[in-house]
């Protein structure tokens, strides 16, 4: 099973000027293919912080996906940080993205400036997925096992929501082509008439006896009660569903329901 970290980069996120809608969309797409998201992290446009945080996330996860910091202005420094992390010694022009820069700006009736052309410059250590929705490419950095103790891949996506969301299918396709993936299965039951703390006490022995590969989450709602979610990562979907159904069947007599 592959673990993933989703990182949003940009001062505008930290000061509340922009709401991060990308992470939830990316997380759902990863969940659908059996990738477990372990962390979501937001940090600002600071060179050292980008390097330190991404190094930490790459050490702990097989997949790291970043959004933001790839624009053409001086405050967009993610590309330079990624070049340093990956040991890049030079930048190269990606012809596919350069063509897209011209097409997008011409369609908007805008001149193509040098600052726009620079969007197609990428570190020589990355692969490129052409961004058909904007001018900044999706950069893919693949790290060997010697670097972080395991093979790791970093996908750097633009932060503009419609561009990031538009790039998700291509990123997911690449992950499926390079990772050994397993199914993830979740199932929920609703419990009424008990607060979360009281419910936790009531089912403590049942929770303690759950198999190690099964995870329980409490999802309280003041209007509808407490939703209990059981999750299994790995195995076949049919087997996972059967096992979860058995555990919920054991729960019913405990609750007297």
Regions found by a protein language model. Give the residues of each.
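Short, structured active-site "lid" loops
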Residues: 55-66
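An accessory alpha-helical subdomain
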Residues: 152-254
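Generic secondary-structure signature for well-ordered alpha-helical cores
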Residues: 31, 35-36, 59, 87-91, ...
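Glycine-rich phosphate/diphosphate-binding loop of Rossmann-like nucleotide-binding domains
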Residues: 1-41, 45, 238-242
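Glycine-rich beta-strand-to-loop/alpha-helix junction loops that act as flexible
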Residues: 9-11, 66-74, 158, 233-235
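Structural motif
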Residues: 3-5, 62-63, 127, 138, ...
């Amino acid at each position: 099973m592959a673990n993933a970290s989703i990182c949003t980069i940009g001062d505008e996120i930290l000061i509340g000027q922009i709401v991060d809608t990308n992470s939830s969309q990316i997380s759902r797409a990863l969940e659908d293919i059996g990738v477990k998201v372990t962390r979501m992290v937001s940090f600002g446009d600071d060179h050292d912080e980008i390097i330190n945080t991404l190094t930490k996330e790459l050490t702990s996860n097989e997949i790291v996906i970043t959004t933001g910091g790839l624009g053409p202005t001086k405050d967009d420094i993610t590309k330079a940080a990624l070049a340093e992390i990956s040991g890049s010694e030079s930048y190269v022009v990606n012809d596919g993205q350069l063509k897209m820069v011209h097409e997008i700006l011409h369609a908007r009736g805008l001149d193509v400036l040098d600052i726009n052309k620079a969007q197609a410059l990428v570190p020589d250590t990355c692969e490129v997925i052409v961004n058909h929705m904007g001018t900044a490419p999706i950069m893919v950095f693949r790290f060997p096992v010697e670097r972080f103790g395991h093979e790791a891949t970093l996908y750097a996506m633009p932060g503009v929501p419609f561009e990031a969301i538009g790039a998700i299918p291509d990123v997911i396709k690449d992950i499926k082509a390079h990772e050994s993936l397993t199914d993830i299965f979740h199932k929920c039951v609703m419990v009424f008439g008990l607060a979360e703390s009281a419910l936790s006490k009531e089912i403590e022995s049942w929770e303690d006896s759950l198999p190690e590969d099964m995870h329980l989450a409490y999802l309280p709602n003041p209007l509808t009660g407490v939703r209990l979610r059981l999750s299994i990562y790995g195995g076949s979907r049919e087997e996972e569903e059967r096992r979860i159904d058995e555990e919920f069947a054991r729960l019913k007599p405990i609750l007297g329901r």
